[in-house]
Amino acid sequence: MAAPVVAPPGVVVSRANKRSGAGPGGSGGGGARGAEEEPPPPLQAVLVADSFDRRFFPISKDQPRVLLPLANVALIDYTLEFLTATGVQETFVFCCWKAAQIKEHLLKSKWCRPTSLNVVRIITSELYRSLGDVLRDVDAKALVRSDFLLVYGDVISNINITRALEEHRLRRKLEKNVSVMTMIFKESSPSHPTRCHEDNVVVAVDSTTNRVLHFQKTQGLRRFAFPLSLFQGSSDGVEVRYDLLDCHISICSPQVAQLFTDNFDYQTRDDFVRGLLVNEEILGNQIHMHVTAKEYGARVSNLHMYSAVCADVIRRWVYPLTPEANFTDSTTQSCTHSRHNIYRGPEVSLGHGSILEENVLLGSGTVIGSNCFITNSVIGPGCHIGDNVVLDQTYLWQGVRVAAGAQIHQSLLCDNAEVKERVTLKPRSVLTSQVVVGPNITLPEGSVISLHPPDAEEDEDDGEFSDDSGADQEKDKVKMKGYNPAEVGAAGKGYLWKAAGMNMEEEEELQQNLWGLKINMEEESESESEQSMDSEEPDSRGGSPQMDDIKVFQNEVLGTLQRGKEENISCDNLVLEINSLKYAYNISLKEVMQVLSHVVLEFPLQQMDSPLDSSRYCALLLPLLKAWSPVFRNYIKRAADHLEALAAIEDFFLEHEALGISMAKVLMAFYQLEILAEETILSWFSQRDTTDKGQQLRKNQQLQRFIQWLKEAEEESSEDD
């Protein structure tokens, strides 16, 4: 295909745009008009088929999260169907944990057929440890050529993002690529079942432009701290919203991948959003949001969300992604739909007297015994249910066997699990693959049974995302350690991971992992709430470090530039190091520019003796400015940035009056290197609210001649226009 050939030039252009805002049409007016008339490039997507956490352990020890069946369809198939329906023509699927299983599934699916409208490209690596690693690899491989969608492989959605994409592209066109991301949200009341507690956010947004001004995870907080500057700007109005569900769908510009490369401390999307909002002035980048009211979007981040989203699919809230649609074109997943949302696959057998009350999906080849009662449940293909069984809000995967007299409430049974006679599973129980429990036993609420011993987790830190991590050791432990009949029954096979009767710390871990956070607001103490609120304040805008931190930062920048000069380090790497120092010491952009300007302007003084000589100073400084000009251009973007840099330059020459006559040459160098613009230099020079020393500095003859030359050049340019 031609796409890989086009990719490198596209990336080069996007990097240039980050600085200048110039389009690919070049400087000619005809080229620009031609570029405007061209259709938008094919839409691409980056699908991250890994969560980089253990939220679904021990379930995901047997299969990756994106292959977990929801309403008998793998999660990743929902995500790919959403991307294809919304117009994506090329999707890069990044896999780490159990990548071989994901690759095998995709290669057998319709997504890898020659007729697929969405070309799926699978990229695997055991080195990915976060979303940040994935996006840095996207940038290194130059995979994206224009705006792209960023999603996880467990997103379920029917949102048509066409309007959001058009708004995103229009903003970037009008504001010269300032907006780098548009986040998709869905209106949803705080009590809605699909609201995931750990994903709850408070968002402050410009009501006119939908620009995100503040983004904060609530995490059970009762109070929130907002920077006062949010409400003091020139915006027409600011909305503070708590009625939004984060769909985990983002429209990204190519700059997003580049920003992850430039800021290696960004590991998650939240890191990225927080970094850009707290330090928005770094590159002048902005984040916007798009809110949908009627469409559906959610991420299956824990079993609470799994249950809620599965129920929504069965109740047809995600239309057209319904069970009978069979959008995967699989012969084993076809089914019929009847009243009360009863879905039956082929070759299903239902015994005499059994009742399917409502919202029930029966997979192909499933056999139901007599006098059973089933409601709000999903039963996978090839399952066998005995007589007199009660299933309420239960999810059975492929090949599960439930013997007579069993009662299962709000629980999950994975592939080939088996429940013996007269077993009761209390709510929020989980049996992972091939576990056997019973007979004649009641599992307490919150029980999690797995064939993997829980103590095998303690020694897995070094290889937590490796497919073979600890596999041999687990097998040895299984051989040495028998099953406890008190936990799993006389004929049971499995180990108890968590149970409601265990200590509070383990219960909290269960809630945070499999079923998600459960916040009891009344029990939260006032001091804890205030402490949590205060902990957010360092991320607020306007916070400045202590003076000694600035001094340390200045010394670190000086050391970085010295090494850069001695070792010939590229400017891109110098920017990376300065950015990491900026975050380490919580330095604002204004302070970065002040320190950078001060350090560079003082750099030649290390090689000079007193008294200072202007000619010698310029001879030493100008080559440094030329070499490090990309570093300056990385931070000096907007008019306000130019004025801050000019103020720092003025402060230096006020401090070193003996070098005052050099200022004109220095400003000329900044101008010729396209670091400072002529209009901002003229604006700075004409400032009237300066000190007496500042006014005296402006009377320097060389400086006045330079300013006069700039004015004449500006007038000539205006006449030519």
Curated annotation (Swiss-Prot):
The gene is EIF2B5. Belongs to the eIF-2B gamma/epsilon subunits family. PROSITE patterns: W2 (PS51363). Residues 543-720 form the W2 domain. It is linked to Leukoencephalopathy with vanishing white matter 5: An autosomal recessive brain disease characterized by neurological features including progressive cerebellar ataxia, spasticity, and cognitive deficits. Brain imaging shows abnormal white matter that vanishes over time and is replaced by cerebrospinal fluid. Disease severity ranges from fatal infantile forms to adult forms without neurological deterioration. The disease is progressive with, in most individuals, additional episodes of rapid deterioration following febrile infections or minor head trauma. Residues 1-40, 444-483, 523-547 are annotated as: Disordered. This is Translation initiation factor eIF2B subunit epsilon. Residues 456-471, 523-537 have a biased composition (Acidic residues). Component of the translation initiation factor 2B (eIF2B) complex which is a heterodecamer of two sets of five different subunits: alpha, beta, gamma, delta and epsilon. Subunits alpha, beta and delta comprise a regulatory subcomplex and subunits epsilon and gamma comprise a catalytic subcomplex. Within the complex, the hexameric regulatory complex resides at the center, with the two heterodimeric catalytic subcomplexes bound on opposite sides. GO terms for molecular function: guanyl-nucleotide exchange factor activity; translation initiation factor activity; translation initiation factor binding. It is found in: Cytoplasm, Cytosol. Changing residue 113 to H: In VWM5; with ovarian failure. GO terms for biological process: astrocyte development; astrocyte differentiation; cytoplasmic translational initiation; hippocampus development; myelination; oligodendrocyte development; ovarian follicle development; positive regulation of apoptotic process.
